[in-house]
Amino acid sequence: MHIIFYGPEGSGKSTQAKLLSEKLKIPALVSGDLVRKYAKEDKGIMGDACREVFKTGHYVADSEMFVLWKHRLKEPDINNGFVIDGFPRNLDQVKFLEEKLDKYQKKEDIVFFLKVSEKESIRRLLKRGRKSPDGSLHDTPEKIKERLRRYKKEEKQVLKFYKKRGLLRVINGEQSIEEIHDNIMGIIKKYE
């Protein structure tokens, strides 16, 4: 299966992606992990771009995300399926992902949208207190609100695209981790 988790930061995408990855025994491809890996390990232009993201609190530019994902989608561990978290974030990224998945004879089976309020996203992110690789606080209230504003601008188009394709499944992301996982597994079982 090829599954995408979509939703604002703090909606629980990473938690659910990792749970589902373990349950289905397929890799979780986490956008943030890719960025952190390049920020830590890459000494070139891509590493610099990823490190800058943590300093500014902005997203990685589409062109740079495309490079990261192009390399990741070629790796053989995803041949039997995957769970994606944190990508795509906008319609250009959706189209890029579609093109790459077609090239590798794969396609999305389900897109889970974890729906949470802005207030809940902010609460969770502040509680998490995520730090950048350099140790500085990445999740300040101002940075969080700015990222959520940018996310909201793109959300409607992305959801419309996946809904039109019949792939979108909306999950109440304000439930417990276990309740969300149970809802997801209930949907997954219909595809087996």
Model segments located where?
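Glycine-rich phosphate-binding loop of ATP-dependent small-molecule kinases
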Residues: 1-192
